[in-house]
């Protein structure tokens, strides 16, 4: 018995690997885990490579204090402009009036061009080549606007007279008659406006009482008869 123990002690001791590490693992399972880890690494790299979106800062709305400050600055600018205009000479005021009026006319003209769909008149009046009624209307509006810029000149009335005459030369007698009728109607309207704008001075004090007699009426009839006779002689 002792001999068997001695022989067993003399024999080599073989250490088996720990089987616990391989429990519940199938063949090739370690390889799958390695592949999974490599995929996760690649996904992390892609996420790192994606460009970050730059956020556009939102413009804050003006506060009450800022709004009040802007209104105050606008009020100061208007006050400075009024002060500047007050110090101008009559000639400078007239020139400033023309400048403001020209700016207003240019703004009105731009609005008219936008209405007709015209984007630019950089080519001048020569760029127009009207054919339809609407195109002639557009051309006329542009020409009238251009001519009206010089209406403050003392030579403007004579210029318009010569211009109308030179244009009407190309018309027939019937068309000139139509132009004449339109001008006469415009003349009548202008007279009405001028009379309405002209205020007649109101006389002060009581009016004098006049005494009319039958002789006054007879004299009036005789005068009317004499005038009628003279007119008749002139006609004959």
Swiss-Prot record:
Gene Ontology terms: biological process: formation of cytoplasmic translation initiation complex; regulation of translational initiation
Entry keyword set: Cytoplasm, Initiation factor, Protein biosynthesis
InterPro entries: eIF3-like_dom_sf, eIF3j
Compartments reported by the entry: Cytoplasm
Biased composition (Basic and acidic residues): 47-58, 68-88
Pfam families: eIF3_subunit
Compositionally skewed regions (Acidic residues) per UniProt: 28-46
Function: Component of the eukaryotic translation initiation factor 3 (eIF-3) complex, which is involved in protein synthesis of a specialized repertoire of mRNAs and, together with other initiation factors, stimulates binding of mRNA and methionyl-tRNAi to the 40S ribosome. The eIF-3 complex specifically targets and initiates translation of a subset of mRNAs involved in cell proliferation.
Complex and partners: Component of the eukaryotic translation initiation factor 3 (eIF-3) complex. The eIF-3 complex interacts with pix.
Protein known as: Eukaryotic translation initiation factor 3 subunit J
Source organism of the structure: Drosophila willistoni (Fruit fly)
Gene, per the UniProt record: eIF3j
């Amino acid at each position: 018995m002792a001999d068997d123990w001695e022989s067993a002690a003399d024999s080599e001791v073989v250490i088996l690997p720990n089987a616990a590490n391989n429990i519940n693992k199938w063949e090739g399972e370690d390889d799958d885990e390695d592949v999974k880890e490599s995929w996760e690494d690649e996904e992390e790299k892609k996420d790192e490579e994606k460009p970050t979106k730059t956020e556009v800062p939102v413009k804050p709305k003006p506060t009450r204090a800022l709004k009040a400050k802007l209104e105050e600055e606008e009020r100061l600018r208007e006050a400075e402009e009024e002060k500047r205009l007050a110090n101008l000479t009559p000639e400078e005021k007239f020139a400033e009036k023309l400048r403001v009026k020209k700016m207003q006319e240019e703004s009105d003209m731009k609005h008219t061009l936008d209405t007709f769909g015209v984007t630019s008149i950089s080519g001048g009046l020569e760029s127009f080549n009207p054919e339809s009624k609407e195109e002639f209307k557009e051309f006329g509006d542009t020409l009238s606007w251009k001519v009206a810029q010089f209406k403050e000149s003392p030579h403007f009335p004579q210029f318009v007279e010569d211009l109308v005459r030179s244009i009407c030369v190309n018309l027939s007698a019937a068309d000139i008659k139509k132009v004449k009728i339109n001008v006469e109607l415009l003349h009548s309207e202008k007279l009405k406006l001028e009379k309405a704008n002209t205020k007649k001075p109101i006389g002060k004090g009581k009016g004098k009482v006049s005494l009319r007699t039958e002789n006054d009426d007879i004299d009036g009839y005789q005068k009317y008869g004499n005038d009628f006779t003279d007119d008749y002689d002139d006609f004959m």
